[in-house]
A protein has these predicted regions:
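Alpha-helical protein-protein interaction modules
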Residues: 2-138
Length: 138
């Protein structure tokens, strides 16, 4: 439900939904799925330090989640921690050396771009800015 809220541009409601999911099932092996959504939503709202925390928990829950490394790099960059951002982006780039911000944005999900709200698209620009700051080429 949180991802639906996120794509509809109801970002604050998405945060509430992701937090509710975590309160209900904090030991669920798939916990990383809503934690990455929480991290993304928090970043979109400008709560970058909280996003770093959620995305670190995402990576603790699923260390192999490659896209999470890039999202964590973006959040770290937005907090001003460029050293941490570059480290996480380097880990991501080792597996995806040709990734660009444009390609990353296009791969965001299986939801068609015209099905997401303008609010979601606008707020997602913060994440792409974080990726650029971390060193991902346009």
């Amino acid at each position: 439900m949180g991802l639906n809220k996120l794509y509809l541009g109801e970002t604050r409601e998405a945060v509430e939904s992701f937090r509710r999911a975590d309160a209900i099932a904090p030991r669920d092996p798939e916990r990383w799925t809503w934690l990455q959504g929480l991290g993304r939503a928090l970043m979109q709202l400008g709560h970058d330090a909280e996003a770093v925390d959620a995305l670190c928990q995402t990576m603790d829950s699923n260390p192999g989640y490659l896209r999470g490394k890039a999202m964590l790099a973006a959040a770290e960059a937005l907090t001003g921690n460029l050293e941490g951002a570059k480290l996480h982006l380097a880990q991501y780039a080792a597996a995806e050396p040709d990734m660009t911000v444009r390609r990353f944005a296009a791969q965001r999900s299986s939801v068609p771009p015209d099905a997401v709200s303008p609010t979601y698209r606008r707020e997602s620009e913060r994440i792409f800015d974080g990726l650029r700051r971390a060193g991902m080429p346009d």
